[in-house]
């Protein structure tokens, strides 16, 4: 659920359209991209709610088959149980590439912060 303060402070003032859904299966056919995250135990006020909800939003191959053929699945990793390992073999599973891209971005950011020069040419090392 989108927290009320985000709805009131951000979504409504900017007239950003959104809708909340309960069923992953009902939503998958309409999505262009699926960004999965784990159900975060530390965000729940009580253990009972976490236990009741933690297994509802699990993506497996059966559910993924409901999605568009070109819909990428993203996830920040590491995962817990929210994406079945069988999904890893599906060409839409883009989370490993996502992690690799993130690694390269961090490397480029660090390199640009170091402001290095090439010892042979004396020129600044460019990040591109």
PLM regions: where:
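Short glycine/proline- and charge-enriched loop/turn segments
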Residues: 13, 44-49, 88-92
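Amphipathic, non-transmembrane alpha-helical secondary structure
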Residues: 25-29, 61, 111
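Short glycine-/small-residue-rich Rossmann-like dinucleotide-binding loops
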Residues: 32, 38-40, 77-78
């Amino acid at each position: 659920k989108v927290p009320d303060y985000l709805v009131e402070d951000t979504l409504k003032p900017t007239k950003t359209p959104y809708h909340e859904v309960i069923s992953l299966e009902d939503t998958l056919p309409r999505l262009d991209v699926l960004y999965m995250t784990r159900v975060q135990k530390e965000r729940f006020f009580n253990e009972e709610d976490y236990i009741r909800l933690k297994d509802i939003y699990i993506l497996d191959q059966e559910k993924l088959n409901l999605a568009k053929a070109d819909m990428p699945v993203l996830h920040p990793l590491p995962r817990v149980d929210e994406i079945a390992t069988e999904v890893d073999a599906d060409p839409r599973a883009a989370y490993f590439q996502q992690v690799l891209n993130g690694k390269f971005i961090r490397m480029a950011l660090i390199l640009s912060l170091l402001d290095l020069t090439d010892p042979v040419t004396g020129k600044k090392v460019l990040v591109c």
